[in-house]
Curated annotation (Swiss-Prot):
Residues 1-19 form the signal peptide. Its main location: secreted. This is Phospholipase B-like protein E. The keyword Lipid metabolism applies. InterPro entries: PLipase_B-like. Probable phospholipase. Glycans are attached at residues 113, 140, 231, 302, 340, 546. Keywords: Glycoprotein, Hydrolase, Lipid degradation, Lipid metabolism, Secreted, Signal. One of its GO terms (molecular function) is phospholipase activity. It comes from the Eukaryota. One of its GO terms (biological process) is phospholipid catabolic process. It is found in: Secreted. It comes from Dictyostelium discoideum (Social amoeba).
Length: 554
C-alpha cells in the first residue's frame, strides 16, 4: 500500500605537467556528440537548445573506449525550480537509461545477491519507502521560501525526473519501479541501511581479526590526498574510490541548473555512476563557489550505533546535494550538510575552497580547508587549514581524524587488540603518504600516488595488496615470515580501488579533471580480468580493465 501511495505522491509533486594524446581526452567538441533537448511538454527531441526547450544535453557511451561514459545536462534559468530540476533529472534518466539498467543488476546483486526487487528483504524496502514518505511529509509542511527547504524540494524533483525519464526511454521489458530507481541513488547510504534492516540486534559484538579485516576491506571506501606544493605554486587533489568491482560502470557528469535559488552551486562536475544524482566517490568541482569536495568513509565498528539510525532523517545523498547548491565556503557547506543527519554513509568530507588560494602565497587563508566527520547521532568539524600548511598535505584513508569520532565508532578496541593497523597515525596508507608526500610536485605525481600499489616491495604494505593507496584485494597476499597472526592477511575478494581522479588549481578554473577507471595496474598488480571472478555479477562490463588516464572536459 505504501508503494502505491508513493507513486501517487510522485505524480504530484590546461597548462599542466602531464601529457595526454587527443585520443585520450574527452570533450564535447566534434561530430561524435549528439545533443538532445527536452521540451516544456517533457518530450525529448534531437538538437541543442531548440526553440521552447527547457533542458538540453548529451551522453557519450565510451565505457569500452576509455572506461567512462560522459554526461552533460543544462537547463534554462527562466522556469520554476520544480520544472528545472525535474527536467535535469528527466533528461539524465532518458539519455542514460541503458547504463542505469546495466548498472542496476550488478548493483543489486552486490548488496542482496539478487536483482529481483521481490527478493529483496521486506525490511529494507520498507525503510526506503518510509524514508521517501518522511521527506515528502517534511517538505509539504515546511516553508516554501526557506533556501534549505527549497533545495530539498529541488533534489526530490530531480529524483522524480530521473525515474520518469528512465521509464520514458526504456522499453516495456526494462521498466523499473520508483523504489528501484531510488535505491540506486541511495548507493552511498545502502550499506548502513542493509546492516540496520537485516541484523537481528545491534549489540556490540567483538570481531576477530578475520571478521574485522573483511568488514574494513568491503566497507572502507576510498583514499584521498590534498597536496600543497613545496613552493606553494599549486594546490592539488587526488582520490581513488574503493568499492566492489561490480559497480565499475561509470559516468563522469557535468550538471548545470542555473536557477536563482542556486547562486553558489548551480554547476557541478563530478565522477559518478548510472542512476545517481550524487558522486558518492566523492569527487566534486562546483561553481561559481569554486568549492572542491572529496571524502573517505569511516566504517562503524561499534554496532550499537545502528540503534540511532532510522528512516525519519535525510540520507547522505540529499544533504550532499543541498550543501553543494547553497554553500559558498567550507563552514557553510559543513553546517548545511549535518542538518537532519541520517547517520548513514559516515564519511570524512574534505571541503577545499579554491577561492581562498593564491599560488606562491606566503601563507594560507583560514577556512581554505574544512573537514567534517559524521556518525549516527552526531558529528565533528573543523578548519584544518593550519594543519595543511604545517604538514604540506591532508590525507584521508578510512580512519577517523577526530579523537571523539574515533572513540565513538569503536576503533580503540581494535587498536588494543591488533595494533597500528587500525590507528589514524600509523596505518599503512598513513605511513605511505607521510613518507612520499614531499615528492608530489606535479599533477602527474598526484596521478602516480593515487594509483600507487607496490605491495611486494613496500615495507608499509607488509606483503598485502590491500595495504596500499589503491588497494587490490582481488590479489592474494601472504603472511609475514614471522607468522605473527596480527600481520597475517585473510580477505580476498573483488574489492579495492576502482579508479583515480585528480585536479590542480588551473583545472578548477577551467572546470576540467583527469580520471582513470578500473583497478590500478602497476608492476606488482596486473590488469583486472573478470575471467578470474566469473561467478561475481559483472554484466555488460569490459572483460579486462586496463584503461589509462584521460582528460575530462565535458
Amino acid at each position: 500500500m505504501k508503494l502505491f501511495i508513493l507513486l501517487i505522491v510522485i505524480v504530484f509533486l590546461i597548462s599542466n605537467s602531464y601529457s595526454l594524446s587527443s585520443s585520450d581526452s574527452s570533450s564535447d567538441s566534434g561530430s561524435d556528440v549528439q545533443y538532445y533537448s527536452l521540451t516544456s511538454q517533457f518530450q525529448v527531441v534531437q538538437g541543442k537548445q531548440i526553440p521552447g526547450s527547457i533542458a538540453w544535453g548529451y551522453f557519450k557511451d565510451e565505457m569500452n573506449k576509455d572506461g567512462w561514459g560522459k554526461l552533460s545536462i543544462e537547463t534554462v534559468s527562466t522556469v520554476s525550480d520544480n520544472i528545472a530540476f525535474k527536467a535535469a533529472g528527466y533528461l539524465e534518466g532518458y539519455l542514460t537509461w541503458e547504463y542505469i539498467y546495466k548498472f542496476s543488476g550488478n548493483y543489486f546483486n552486490s548488496f542482496f545477491n539478487t536483482s529481483n526487487i521481490k527478493e529483496i528483504p521486506t525490511e529494507t524496502l520498507t525503510f526506503v519507502s518510509d524514508n521517501w514518505e518522511y521527506m515528502m511529509e517534511r517538505v509539504n509542511s515546511s516553508s516554501t521560501t526557506d533556501p534549505y527547504w527549497i533545495q530539498i524540494r529541488n533534489a526530490m524533483s530531480q529524483q522524480i525526473g530521473l525515474y520518469e525519464g528512465y521509464n520514458a526511454a526504456a522499453g516495456e521489458d526494462y521498466q523499473k519501479t520508483f523504489i528501484e530507481i531510488y535505491m540506486i541513488n541511495l548507493y552511498g547510504d545502502m550499506g548502513d541501511i542493509v546492516t540496520l534492516t537485516t541484523t537481528p540486534n545491534n549489540e556490540f559484538i567483538p570481531m576477530d581479526r578475520k571478521e574485522v579485516e573483511q568488514l574494513m576491506a568491503t566497507t572502507g571506501h576510498c583514499t584521498s590526498i590534498i597536496k600543497l606544493t613545496n613552493n606553494c605554486s599549486d594546490l592539488m587533489s587526488a582520490h581513488t574510490s574503493w568499492a566492489d568491482f561490480s559497480v565499475m560502470i561509470r559516468i563522469y557528469k557535468r550538471i548545470n541548473i542555473p536557477v536563482a535559488s542556486t547562486p553558489y552551486g548551480s554547476e557541478t562536475l563530478f565522477s559518478s555512476y548510472p542512476g545517481l544524482l550524487v558522486s558518492i566517490d566523492d569527487f566534486y568541482q562546483i561553481r561559481p563557489s569554486k568549492l572542491h569536495l572529496t571524502e573517505t568513509l569511516n566504517t562503524i565498528l561499534n554496532q550499537t550505533l545502528y540503534q540511532q539510525i532510522n528512516a525519519q532523517s535525510f540520507m547522505y545523498w540529499v544533504r550532499n546535494l543541498v550543501a553543494n547548491r547553497l554553500a559558498n565556503n567550507g563552514f557553510q557547506w559543513v553546517s548545511i550538510f549535518v542538518e537532519n543527519n541520517s547517520g548513514t554513509n559516515n564519511i570524512q568530507f574534505v571541503v577545499l575552497d579554491y577561492k581562498l588560494f593564491t599560488p606562491y602565497s606566503t601563507e594560507l587563508q583560514s577556512d581554505l580547508l574544512w573537514i567534517v566527520e559524521q556518525y549516527p547521532g552526531g558529528y565533528q568539524a573543523a578548519d584544518v587549514t593550519l594543519t595543511l600548511w604545517e604538514q604540506g598535505y591532508w590525507p584521508s584513508y578510512n580512519r577517523p581524524y577526530f579523537e571523539e569520532v574515533f572513540d565513538i565508532l569503536g576503533y580503540p578496541y581494535y587498536v588494543e587488540k591488533f595494533g597500528d593497523l587500525f590507528t589514524y597515525e600509523y596505518n599503512p596508507r598513513a605511513n605511505i603518504f607521510r613518507r612520499d608526500h614531499s615528492k608530489l610536485e606535479t599533477l602527474q605525481d598526484m596521478m602516480n600516488i593515487i594509483d600507487y600499489n607496490q605491495y611486494k616491495t613496500d615495507p608499509f604494505s607488509m606483503g598485502y595488496p590491500g595495504n596500499s593507496i589503491n588497494a587490490r584485494f582481488d590479489i592474494k597476499g601472504g603472511s609475514l615470515p614471522s607468522g605473527n597472526p596480527i600481520y597475517s592477511w585473510f580477505y580476498h575478494g573483488t574489492h579495492g580501488g576502482i579508479d583515480g581522479k585528480a585536479i590542480n588549481y588551473d583545472m578548477v578554473n577551467s572546470f576540467t579533471a583527469v580520471a582513470r577507471n578500473g583497478p590500478t595496474v602497476t608492476s606488482d598488480c596486473p590488469p583486472f580480468n573478470w575471467n578470474d571472478w566469473s561467478l561475481i555479477s559483472h554484466q555488460y562490463m569490459p572483460q579486462i580493465y586496463n584503461f589509462t588516464w584521460i582528460s575530462i572536459n565535458i
